[in-house]
Regions:
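Helix-to-loop junction immediately C-terminal to a conserved catalytic motif
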Residues: 48
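The feature captures the beta-strand-to-loop junction immediately N-terminal to the Walker
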Residues: 33-35
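Conserved signature/switch motifs of ABC ATPase nucleotide-binding domains
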Residues: 126-129, 147
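Short coil-to-helix segment of the ABC ATPase nucleotide-binding domain corresponding to the Q-loop/switch region
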Residues: 86-94
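Catalytic Walker B motif of ABC-type/P-loop ATPase nucleotide-binding domains
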Residues: 152-155
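Conserved ABC transporter NBD signature motif
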Residues: 56-68, 110
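Conserved ABC ATPase "signature" region
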Residues: 98, 105-123, 175
Length: 252
């Protein structure tokens, strides 16, 4: 379980986040949306331990976050810069396992297992610069999953991809969540995406001093489908509710 209690964050005299209190149960996929510049990425980096909370506390499974927990993985939007161009796809994915001291054969087997899962088994010997943007992001996701994290943080991971590739990766994320039960915090600027992939959507107010203004459960019937789900009355209504919350002066 992830717990944030009265978390505040600032850069010098500039307050970014104010009084963020949030509980994310184990196995939940939480989406965070809000206006540009409201501190969504700062919130994610604070959860990850990359930025110490200036106020309040962050705990994962009851333990205070004082650095990046071993049970946590992060996927950023800028997949191109997160991969090492001189390493093969397999070696990029296996890198966290090397740091954990696994033998070469074990690293290779685990990397191949996860590459097959994300649909890249035929690209193991290639290098990142030989791949499309969508394939590079699949590599980044595979590298995050290879250590079997209990908490996965994703910072607008599909924001720079074309629509078809984004939909494919949204469905991959849902499959991973459904199969592994990983707790996921997913930051996005795309309201439709938040409703489609999320179990719950949290809306942040504009900055400075962003706070949570809406906390909405996502209750959609049936298994998610890119065409059928987006046409459901429940989807349309919730999308409108999230959109109003993001744009409303109530959030200011």
């Amino acid at each position: 379980m992830l717990q944030l209690t009265a978390v505040g964050q600032r850069y010098g005299d500039h307050r970014v986040l104010h009084d963020i209190t949030l509980t994310v149960p184990a196995g939940q996929l939480l989406c965070v949306v809000g206006p540009s510049g409201c501190g969504k990425s700062t919130l994610l980096r604070t959860i990850a331990g990359l930025l110490p909370a200036r106020e309040g506390t962050v705990t994962v499974d009851g333990a205070p976050v004082t650095g990046v927990p071993d049970s946590l993985a992060v996927v950023f939007q800028d997949y191109g810069r997160s991969l090492f161009p001189w390493l093969t796809v397999r070696d990029n994915v296996a890198l966290p396992l090397r740091r954990r001291g696994l033998a070469r054969a074990e690293r290779r087997a685990e990397a191949d297992r996860i590459l097959d899962r994300v649909g890249l088994s035929g690209a193991a010997h290639r290098h990142p610069w030989q791949l499309s943007g969508g394939m590079q992001q699949r590599v980044a996701i595979a590298r995050a999953l290879v250590c079997r994290p209990t908490l996965l943080l994703m910072d607008e991971p599909f924001g720079s991809l074309d629509a078809q590739t984004r939909e494919d990766l949204e469905d991959l994320l849902l499959e991973v969540h459904r199969t592994d039960g990983t707790t996921i915090v997913f930051v996005t600027h795309d309201i439709d995406e938040s409703v489609y992939v999320g179990d719950r959507v949290v809306v942040l107010s504009p900055g400075p001093g962003s706070r949570i203004v809406r906390d909405l459960p996502v209750r959609l019937p049936g298994r998610r489908d890119q065409i059928a789900t987006r046409g459901l009355p429940e989807f349309v209504a919730l999308r409108a509710e999230v959109g109003r919350a993001v744009r409303s002066r109530e959030a200011e």
